[in-house]
Curated annotation (Swiss-Prot):
Molecular functions per Gene Ontology: rRNA binding; structural constituent of ribosome
GO cellular component, one term: cytosolic large ribosomal subunit
Keyword annotations from UniProtKB, A to Z: Ribonucleoprotein, Ribosomal protein, RNA-binding, rRNA-binding
Protein name, per record: Large ribosomal subunit protein uL24
Similarity-based family: Belongs to the universal ribosomal protein uL24 family.
Quaternary structure and partners: Part of the 50S ribosomal subunit.
Biological role: One of two assembly initiator proteins, it binds directly to the 5'-end of the 23S rRNA, where it nucleates assembly of the 50S subunit.
GO BP terms: translation
Coiled-coil residue windows: none
Length: 108
């Protein structure tokens, strides 16, 4: 089960981007990686398709995937990171499960 989902606020806990935070844009479950907004940017050079002989390239930057074990969920109310441990609470009005942090009982 993946604890980190699309739209979650996460913090990088190891590596060159340690301490950086952002929102998860996409989770790649088969590769066990996630793409985080503004973290792990790489430059990609793409050729223009104007004609076959043109050799112009446009450098653009985009986010590269990060392994999930380098990320931790961030509790915005408590202003601290939590590694894993999520429990579910059933909302009595809507009868739906909501994810909450086990340590602080704040909703994710």
């Amino acid at each position: 089960m993946q604890r980190i989902r699309k739209g979650d606020k996460v913090v990088v806990i190891t590596g060159k981007n340690k301490g950086g935070s952002g929102i998860v844009l996409k989770v790649l479950t088969k590769q066990n990686k996630a793409i985080v907004e503004g973290i792990n940017k790489v430059t990609v050079h793409k050729k223009e398709q104007v004609n076959k002989r043109s050799k112009q390239t446009n450098p653009t930057t985009k986010e590269a995937p990060l392994p999930l074990n380098k990320l931790a969920l961030f509790d915005q109310k408590a202003k601290q990171q939590t590694i894993g441990k999520i429990k579910y609470q059933i909302d009595p009005k809507t009868k739906q499960k909501t994810r909450v942090f086990k340590k602080t009982n704040n909703a994710i």
